[in-house]
Design a protein with these regions (language model features):
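Beta-propeller domains
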Residues: 1-300
Length: 300
């Protein structure tokens, strides 16, 4: 996100509320993924909001009614699980703070990612797995899928430092409908500043994260807010062909709750939908926890 962009960004897609997805009482943070075969939508959610109750359920989503039609217990535990596809396999990220693991749903094995932090945004690119560690400044690593070791990726830096921007969904392949204006704005900037050639869309990915801040008053007296932003990574978009990252603030719908975390993007009948985990207060308290579905449409 360049400093001159308005809030919300004119290059970000629009969110239109479709429905609330009914879920088991007390369960929270459902992340959905189109199966590698393209036939089903599977998901993973935390069974209870209570701080020490971290069992993860697997579910399937009916693509016509958009209602969960099957719940199953799993051996997975997680804080706020995220699901993504890498090399034809669905992985579930447990997203524990300073103790992140990936669960391979085929082999039923865990891989410990040797890093600290959480809210890592994974991107499967040309058979290799990467993750965004920080949004601002942009920090990216590549994962060794045998050992869990990580290697720093040399990326373009723009000098920004803003800890409000945090990860959410994994990365998805460039979408010409949702991302065109954002990528065009990036390319115009790159062309004027660095003389880069036109983008290679095979190298471009997008996802969504949450921006954390307190409204009206600072912590702990202010109102906790999680707003949504879109990120776009171009693996060759920066100076000297380095990966580049741009952020675009999204206009949150009026019905969205104070804490609105994007968990995943799914495709149904050639349309893109975002799934969110929402509440009015921070987690781990007795309150209404909501799983919402929004249709994503091009920027106005």
């Amino acid at each position: 996100m360049t400093s001159s962009e308005a809030f919300p960004s004119p290059n970000a897609p629009n969110m239109t509320h479709v429905k609330r997805i009914p879920t088991l009482k007390n369960s929270i943070f459902y992340s959905f993924v189109n199966s590698p075969e393209g036939t089903t939508i599977e998901g993973y959610g935390r069974k209870s909001w209570r701080i020490y109750h971290r069992d993860v359920l697997s579910v399937t989503l009916d693509q016509s009614s958009m209602i969960i039609n099957e719940y199953k217990d799993t051996p997975i535990t997680g804080e706020d699980p995220r699901a993504f596809v890498h090399n034809g396999t669905v992985y579930v990220q447990d997203n524990y703070l300073n103790d992140c693991h990936l669960y391979n749903t085929k082999t039923k094995e865990y891989l410990k990612i040797k890093t600290k932090g959480k809210n890592l945004s994974f991107i499967s690119h040309k058979g290799r797995l990467y993750f965004i560690y920080y949004m601002s400044p942009f920090i990216m690593y590549e994962v060794n899928m045998t050992t869990g070791d990580i290697t720093t990726v040399d990326v373009e830096q723009d000098g920004s430092h803003n800890g409000e921007y945090r990860g959410g969904t994994p990365g998805y392949k460039y979408d010409p409908i949702l991302c065109f204006k954002a990528v065009l704005s990036q390319q115009l900037s790159a062309s004027s500043n660095m003389g880069n050639p036109g983008p290679n869309y095979e190298n471009i990915y997008y996802g969504f994260g949450h921006r954390v801040y307190y409204k009206d008053r600072p912590f702990p007296d202010g109102i906790l807010k999680h707003d949504i932003f879109m990120w776009v990574v171009d693996f060759e978009g920066g100076e000297n062909g380095k990966p580049s990252l741009r952020l675009y603030d999204v206009s949150k719908p009026a019905n969205a709750k104070n804490v609105c975390d994007p968990t995943s993007v799914i495709s149904i009948n050639n349309k893109k939908y975002m799934v969110t985990a929402e509440s009015n207060e921070w987690w781990f308290v007795e309150q209404e926890y909501v799983t919402n579905l929004y249709e994503l449409t091009p920027p106005s």
